[in-house]
Amino acid sequence: MAQQDVKPTRSELINLKKKIKLSESGHKLLKMKRDGLILEFFKILNEARNVRTELDAAYEKSTEKINLASAVNGMVAVKSTAFTAKEYPEIQLSGHNIMGVVVPKISSTGVRKPLYERGYGIIGTNSYIDETADAYEELVEKIIAAAELETTMKRLLDEIEKTKRRVNALEFKVIPELIATMKYIRFMLEEMERENTFRLKRVKARMKN
């Protein structure tokens, strides 16, 4: 707010006081929101780290199982078995609210299947195929869990950055400028008051003479 564009009036001073009070209140609320979002972010971060560790372990396990199954049965047989699946997992997307931020909720059905629902015949396959299917079903579950948590973290982090910018703008620009303008108006009003007092004294002095 440019001070030269402000009229040094009492009504303007009152308006500025209201703006300062409102800005300080908004600043306080935004700081609370920022701190709350940061707390939520770190809660989810710990969970995401655990899920990521589990995902890495599931990936290594599934790779080991498919390599073993391929060594025993041949890669062509393993791929042919995989293509016999008649039903595929379904993903459901919804959202929920964390301190005003809509984050994803990812649920799934049909990831884990009993042996008889996998599509391939029990006869003609062996336990290596079954263990590979188990490992990959677990891997898909971990991928879904990691996707939900990591997307949530990204959205929270984006909102934290936006809120921090607004907090800083109020704290270091808006509020200081409002306070400086308020002081300027007070100074000008005091100057005008002194000038008026001085003029009145001169008028009274002339009247006495």
Swiss-Prot record:
Gene3D superfamilies: 1.10.287.3240. The keyword Cell membrane applies. It comes from the Archaea. PANTHER family: V-TYPE ATP SYNTHASE SUBUNIT D (PTHR11671). Has multiple subunits with at least A(3), B(3), C, D, E, F, H, I and proteolipid K(x). Component of the A-type ATP synthase that produces ATP from ADP in the presence of a proton gradient across the membrane. This is A-type ATP synthase subunit D. It comes from Methanosarcina acetivorans (strain ATCC 35395 / DSM 2834 / JCM 12185 / C2A).
